[in-house]
Amino acid sequence: MKTVTEFQNKNILVLGIAKSGYAAATLLQKLGANVIVNDGKPLAENVLAAELQAKGMDVVCGGHPLELLERNISLVVKNPGIPYSNPILVAAKEKQIPIVTEVELAYRISEAPFVGITGSNGKTTTTMLTFEMLKEGQKHPVIAGNIGTVACEVAQDAKENEVVVTELSSFQLMGVELFQPKIAAFLNLFEAHLDYHGTKKEYGLAKANIFKNQTENDYSVINADDADVMALSAYSKGQKVLFSTTKEIEDGACIKDNALYFKGEKVVEVGDIVLPGQHNLENILAAMSIAKLLGVSNEAITAVLKRFTGVKHRLEYVTTINNRKFYNDSKATNMLATEKALSAFTQPTVLLAGGLDRGNEFDDLIPYFKNVKAIVTFGQTAPKLVRAAEKAGLDTIESVDTLDEAVVKAYAHSTDGDVILLSPACASWDQFKTFEERGDIFIQAVHKLI
């Protein structure tokens, strides 16, 4: 860990606990800061807050009183999920108090360079692929962020010869000041998180913060097939490395002659790749680009692609019951992810979908319903998904209250040779704490059918 003195004896407010807030508060105390921790949940229900209080921190729970800002606060470290419209953040901004997220702290203390990966979809798969390729290539990667360990915990122990690979959301990237990844990858952009950002434009600008501090000594890995991403890459001063699944890229990554190429050199045959889904070729090209920029050999990349079958909750094969194959795609928290999941199958499919209502309709899914024989909806968005299914002309449409019920109904509507797919097209927070919990409950419900 770098020797950092900028936080010593400073009053720093950590807003929102959870895993990242807990880690940030613990680190800041270690760095000599006077840490004030604030969380909306009452202290009696807040185990993490009680632990921080036991460590000697000033803990205020049960709301976000504006009076906290009267304590000569020099920095606010906020949980990524707390919107900037929260009154305490509005007031902090008016007082010109810097507001950052935990990944910013991680960067400031890390001896190791960062690889940052963002996009509307494919972040987790690309991050895991990158990690595995760097590991196979003996580049000493450590994984952090939305998957793996909280970034500032990883960064404390990361050495100069290691690489911190981190998946970054728009929420995290809104709170960066100095964060400068050696390699920044921007995979794709489409309309999402409008309840948080307001517009697609603001959402895209938040993600473009990944380029904010890059220089000509850094690299920006860009999806050449996404016009929005290409436009936002103008914010990068780094060396741009493009990837495309639709056209040849001489100075980047592409597919030609049924093989993946990087800067004109064949890296791997498409036939050697075991990860299913056409959409995953984009993720592979991005990860391959990062790996090649960091000096990983073609042999190491090929070895990973011959064994990497995917990540949990992302088109995860669960089991086969009476010749019906069950897939868990709980990580599909938006329409684009579900579109890609549906495109991965040619068999008749029974779709389970629904979740948190973020204000969007689901008509964009209609062209992808061509192999969907039945849909079972649940959660807040069930009525909207029913409307889309009716417009698509589906014969079998059913709504239920719980995911357990949805699994039973989906099986009842299936026949020999069908795929039964959980791909919600929505966030999970209306009924579940996380998409992981939703996926685990789906898997448990499937096994109850046996």
Swiss-Prot record:
Keyword terms, alphabetized: ATP-binding, Cell cycle, Cell division, Cell shape, Cell wall biogenesis/degradation, Cytoplasm, Ligase, Nucleotide-binding, Peptidoglycan synthesis
Binding site for ATP: 119-125
Pfam families with a match to the protein in the record: Mur_ligase_C (PF02875), Mur_ligase_M (PF08245), MurD-like_N (PF21799)
Catalyzed chemical reaction(s): UDP-N-acetyl-alpha-D-muramoyl-L-alanine + D-glutamate + ATP = UDP-N-acetyl-alpha-D-muramoyl-L-alanyl-D-glutamate + ADP + phosphate + H(+)
Gene Ontology cellular-component annotations: cytoplasm
Protein's cellular compartments: Cytoplasm
Entry EC number(s): 6.3.2.9
A molecular function (GO) term: ATP binding
InterPro entries according to UniProt: Mur-like_cat_sf, Mur_ligase_C, Mur_ligase_C_dom_sf, Mur_ligase_cen, MurD
Main enzyme class: ligase
Single biological process term from Gene Ontology: cell wall organization
Pathway: Cell wall biogenesis; peptidoglycan biosynthesis
Record family assignment: Belongs to the MurCDEF family.
Described function: Cell wall formation. Catalyzes the addition of glutamate to the nucleotide precursor UDP-N-acetylmuramoyl-L-alanine (UMA).
Record's protein name: UDP-N-acetylmuramoylalanine--D-glutamate ligase
UniProt organism field: Bacillus cereus (strain Q1)
Taxonomic classification: Bacteria, Bacillati, Bacillota, Bacilli, Bacillales
